[in-house]
Every structure is written in C-alpha cells, then in structure tokens.
Design a protein with these regions (language model features):
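Histidine- and/or cysteine-centered catalytic micro-motif in compact active-site loops
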Residues: 47-49, 58-59
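Short Gly/Pro-enriched turn/cap motifs at secondary-structure boundaries
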Residues: 34-37
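C-terminal binding/interaction regions
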Residues: 2-32, 81-138
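Compact, glycine-rich, soluble single-domain proteins
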Residues: 57-72
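Short beta-strand scaffold segments in enzyme catalytic cores
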Residues: 39-48
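Feature captures the catalytic cores and cofactor-binding loops of soluble hydro-lyases/lyases
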Residues: 72-81
C-alpha cells in the first residue's frame, strides 16, 4: 500500500471512490477556513464507519497556539453527529492539493480511527500506523 501519487497516479486516486468525494468535501470545507493571519486555508474530510462523511476547516486565533487545525473541527463534527470511527481521511490546502496532517493531528486522528485508518497523503495511500508508528496510547 505504498503507492506513489505523483503525476498521473494522483489523478487516478483522486478519481476513485471514496477519495473523489472526500477530496471534494475537503475542498468545500476549506473554503470556510478562518485564516486572517497566515492566509493558509486547510480543509479536511473523512468517511465514518457508518457511511457518513464529516469535514472541518482550520480556524486561526491571534494567539497562534490556540489555532484549531481542520482535523480538530472534523473530529468535533464526528462526535456532534453521533460518533463512530474514521475509516478514510484526506486534507487539502488552499489550492485543493493533498496535504499530510501535522504530528498533533496524526495523534488526534489515531484516537478516532486507529492504526488502520486510511489516509491519502502527499506520499501515497498510507495507514495511520505508517504515518504515526508507535502512537501514544493510554
């Protein structure tokens, strides 16, 4: 499952389900990002084990440490709409290009999707275990 998504392969993956729908939803969420300081919009979308799609966008704060990543909004939407486990995830930047979640968000996603959560990343399709080996677990 370590496919490269450079060039043509990226276009193939983006056209496949569930990725096509998730990327579209992440791009839609990204349009609502509140980024008056960095101007760096991020949108995220995920498929839930019951078939729902949840999404989120980043929300900045003048005190940068209080900024909420798009993944935080996504997890909040997950629980506000009934909970469940994430099965597939993608996030995009302001141009709609695929991004890798930051370290904090990888830990957050692991909590709500586990080791086998599928992620579409800049380096291909990956499991959460591949992008966050030895995740912290209580």
């Amino acid at each position: 499952m370590t496919e490269s998504i450079k060039g043509a392969r990226l276009e193939e993956l983006i056209a496949e389900q569930p990725w096509a729908g998730l990327i579209e939803e992440a791009r839609r969420a990204m349009q609502h990002a509140y980024v008056p300081y960095s101007r760096f919009k991020v949108g995220a979308a995920a498929l839930v084990d019951d078939g729902r799609v949840v999404s989120g966008c980043n929300v900045e704060n003048g005190s940068y440490g209080l900024t909420l990543c798009a993944e935080c909004g996504l997890v909040s939407a997950l629980h506000a709409s009934g909970g469940g486990r994430l099965t597939h995830f993608v996030c995009v930047d302001g141009q709609g290009s695929v991004l890798m979640p930051c370290g904090r968000c990888r830990q957050l996603l692991h909590e709500h999707g586990g080791d086998q959560l599928q992620l579409l990343t800049v380096s291909g399709l990956r499991t959460m275990d591949q992008v966050l080996p030895d995740a912290f677990v209580l």
